[in-house]
Amino acid sequence: MTQDELFKVLVAHCKEYGFIFPSSEIYDGLAAVYDYGQMGVELKNNIKRYWWESMTRLHENVVGIDSCIFMHPKTWVASGHVAAFNDPLIDNKDSKKRYRADNLIEDYLGKIEEKIEKEVAKGRKKFGDSFDEAKFRETNPNILREKAKYEAVHNRYVAAEQANDLKEYKQIILDCGIVDPISGTANWTDVRQFNLMFSTQISNTGDADDKIYLRPETAQGIFVEYLNVQKTGRMKIPFGIAQIGKAFRNEIVARQFIFRMREFEQMEMEFFCRPGTEMEFFKYWKETRMKWHVNLGMGAENYRFHDHEKLAHYANAATDIEFNFPFGFKELEGIHSRTDFDLGNHSKLSGKKIQYFDPETGESYVPYCVETSIGVDRMFLAVLSHSYKVEDLENGESRVVLSIPAPLAPVKVAILPLLKKDGLPELAQEVVNEIRYDFNYQYDEKDSIGKRYRRQDAIGTPFCVTVDHDSLKDHCVTVRDRDTMEQVRVPISELRAMIDKKVNMSNLLRGIEG
């Protein structure tokens, strides 16, 4: 199965099993807007809980808030979003489709990287154990040719980004022979800037002065509440403020399922520190956030850092944690050193003094800030895309299984009476009563036990508990493990402790520091 095929199958699986639905589907849906179903909302909430508790419980100096979506419009003037929150837009005249010019160039560069890696893979296969990858990359003529092409285009692209040269964007697209994937032509319009903020009116007068925005990020809610949190919480520098919430961006091209949407959810933390110490904390949060991801057990090889060559207007250092999605390595989380840009600008525009008096140094200053920002929806997609597997079984059949990290699984345990008679459902209900206050569970007595196992595999349930006739005699049940399919007999009295050991969020959190 190719990566494209896997992605299509995954999207269909999400709908079939209640993870994600196209929003307003009875009205033919709305492009790039999705609803989370009964399984999806549980997984999403577990992801958010893992992040929230890792921030606010594992760090004594990080606290949380929940700010509003609507904020005073001057907030977005101070943050720079009104003037500079734009993407470069280009249209194909033949297909009438719209694209981000920078994405077209980045996809072109990505294809060159793929060619290089395929050449390396061929060399590895040809030379076996004697393969010297470093030397091969330095001497292979095909790789050297592709590297030279990559560097030439990449250097032009970086220069165009830094200069905000829209004409050069288009010229790179033309020089590289980049064509529209639908029409196959290079009949492009000029590149122009497109502001990504949604706006509305706060009253019914329609007056331009009533214009407000749907927040494009949650971070500004933290910055404008900095003084309130610092004073009421008696917080000492360094400290952080965490928040989970919805944000909205009028994306030019919303694509790749829930990877890029117009309405999405962010998990952001702003860490305030003394000027001059920000790079120390930038390094700390860079390492800490990578540990958080790798701790889920989805393979360290599926993550990588990508340091920014072009920095945002507010940053003096920035890196992305990229994940290997079905469509390649893409940004999952950003870590940025934002300096004092935000607090400083809000102080100037509001006329309010936003400073911190440091009792250790006896000086007052505007704190610097290091930010970690991750999309809940992208994290959801990372977990699902890595977890989805089709396995061949010894009997010649196959099964679809979601090997979701157990603490994140929507349903932790399924209680399955072998038959709907002989007192088995009644005993199964007793088992339910043993675990219902501790775990999200499903009770299922319909169809054969094999079909019920497959249904639970498909939604990622770590344990299936079967109540059979022997259970009536020995008060034990058969517990089936999702990943190994191994089955063991366990006394009902010990069932809760056995399940808890694997699915408890606390054990997952301990792994970050272990």
Q: Can you name each region flagged by the protein language model?
A:
Residues 1-514:
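NTP/phosphate- and nucleic-acid-binding module
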